[in-house]
Amino acid sequence: MTSAPAVPPVGRGPIVRTIAAELRRVRGDPLPWAFLPAMLFLIVSLLASLPAELGIAPAPAIAEVAVGLSASVFSSLILVVAVLGALGVTLADKAGVLARAQLYGGPVAVFGVRAATTLLTSLLLGGVGAVALETAFLVASGQELLPPATAGRTLAAIGAAGLWGYLVGVLIRSPILVLFVVPATLVPAALLADIAPSLADVLPLQTLLSSAGLAHEGLGGAASAAIACAWLLVLGAAAVLVVRRRDRL
């Protein structure tokens, strides 16, 4: 009587190994937690500038303050999250983490999984910032800062900003350089808002704000969301080309 052939152990595939390694990295990554206090400090500083009599102001006046405050705070939050997304991948590349990870998972798995965790981290930081801002404004004025639908779209815009920074980081791979390049890709929309509003309306920052419903001038939400997606697709295509050439995909 012959015994059944031994079944070879089933090994984990490259994507599973890459996901497991990335989850371990995210749990111990200090970078998001270093940015979180700075982000909360920014929110508290802006709220401290609100007039003390806001709580007894008429509802239209409070709504006007809410519009200006939300646009200002979330513009800054988008910029911070984008820089964080770029720093994560560039610091990993400089430390050799990406090169080592590709020995087991390959570029597609490594960069794809890192993009997903960057998106999730951006959504987490954006959610914490939005809840803190909403709570503080509610206490100060007695009214909500953003309707639930607008808050959801704003969170999506913050997630897109994290991906934007990540893709810029994949292209550049320099932690110092992304501190200047990422803002340079977003800030011009604010600088051109008064000089050339039609041009500013199609730039990345303005399309993200408009898609979230935080900008009450220019293109509508659907058109802005489509343009923002187009920007991400173009940048993503460029990042894929760079990865294919630099990382020998």
What role is predicted for each listed range?
Residues 1-19, 196-202:
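Short, membrane-interfacial amphipathic segments enriched in basic
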Residues 5-12, 30-32, 36-88, 111-175, ...:
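Secretory targeting signals
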Residues 48, 173-209:
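Transmembrane helix segments
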Residues 99, 111, 179-180:
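Hydrophobic/aromatic positions within or immediately flanking transmembrane alpha-helices
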Residues 100-108:
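Short helix-to-coil transition segments within interhelical loops
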Residues 240-249:
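Membrane-interface capping segments at transmembrane-helix boundaries
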